[in-house]
Design a protein with these regions (language model features):
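Carbohydrate-binding surfaces of carbohydrate-active enzymes
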Residues: 6-169
Length: 169
């Protein structure tokens, strides 16, 4: 239960990777809002992709401007921080193929300038956004106890709690 887990933590956070395809604003918005609800305040996006990932069936890169839109989308849902994984390409192993801000020699990759632009924009907007809150006109209740109960005693084999939640979101 993420709500119980978050009680003793300083902040709530999540990792956001697209994998194959491109930004799905509804799904990511729902997860942003759920994460904000764990502590009933702002959250951090502690990992998001700088370009492509290395573990999906098709590891396409993000379109130009897509990472910037993703960062502002997170802020609009209450993120206080947007962090990228990873900074520099690994010298070996699976993650050497994961998108990064700089290559193994420290030279900027194509995504570096977009991340730098996001940082500049955040620096300008920070005084306006500090201590702001997200105001919602409606709420959807999320219950892990109900979700787990339904998983163990399905009333219909095709029922998917998360898909049902996202349908109403």
């Amino acid at each position: 239960d993420h709500y119980v887990l978050s009680e003793d933590l300083d902040l709530a956070s999540w990792d956001w990777y697209i994998g194959t395809g491109h930004h799905d604003y509804l799904t990511s918005g729902a997860v942003h809002d759920l994460t904000r609800g764990f502590k009933r305040r702002t959250f951090w996006l502690i990992e998001t992709q700088p370009g492509n990932v290395n573990w999906s069936s098709i590891n396409n890169t993000l379109n130009k401007g897509e990472a910037r839109a993703m960062a502002w989308h997170a802020v609009a849902h209450g993120a206080d921080a947007v962090l990228y994984w990873q900074w520099r390409s690994a010298p070996g192993g699976q993650e050497q193929y994961h998108g990064t801000l700089v290559d193994q020699s420290g030279q900027p990759r194509p995504f570096y300038e977009e991340a730098h632009e996001v940082a500049r924009n955040f620096a300008v907007a920070s005084p306006l956004l500090s201590d702001s809150t997200t105001i919602s006109d409606a709420a959807i209740l999320n219950s892990y106890d109900s979700r787990w109960s339904i998983q163990w005693q399905r009333h219909h084999r095709d029922f998917d709690y998360v898909a049902h939640f996202n349908h109403y979101y």
